[in-house]
């Protein structure tokens, strides 16, 4: 039981740190300010609104006349908003989608810390629990996250990457390929745009 509780510590620590930052800068849920900027303002949030319309039946997945004079949302979905967490937009009021961006970033940072912790615990078994927490939190808040959270689906690559590494390790150590195939397939499905780099890796 103690081991399971230790697995929860890195995501909890990352979530707490994230909430502290949100509170200091008066970001939602502590105020009505959003993290949304740059590409998130111009592309991600409007496309999340489109996804909400598709999920509610107000728009079509394959032909959306409101975009570019009539285009398929399918390609856009696989490029910008195909994260499983994007589906939560179905439960968000349209007026709150900019605030929902904060929730998406928060969730993905927490999950990043969780999967990083899983990798460190499995690969480096002699790590002390505090070392595991520190490394996992640093991974979750690395420079990539701080810069590219504006393209929030890119953070899905961050939380999937430690699982992919575990899959590679299983191929080397145990000659078992299933975890690697599942992780790579999930990453390609979530965001094919970045996955060519992952596949090259």
Where is each model-derived feature located?
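Positively charged n-region of N-terminal signal peptides that target proteins for export
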Residues: 1-6, 122, 173-175
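Membrane-embedded helix bundles of polyisoprenyl
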Residues: 15-18, 110-119, 129-172, 176-201
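Start-transfer (signal-anchor) and selected internal transmembrane alpha helices
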Residues: 1-27
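Structural signal for the C-terminal ends of transmembrane alpha-helices
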Residues: 24-26, 92, 120-124, 167-173
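Alpha-helical transmembrane segments with an aromatic anchor "belt"
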Residues: 100-103, 124-129
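Coil-to-alpha-helix initiation sites in intrinsically disordered, low-complexity, charged segments
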Residues: 3, 60, 72, 128, ...
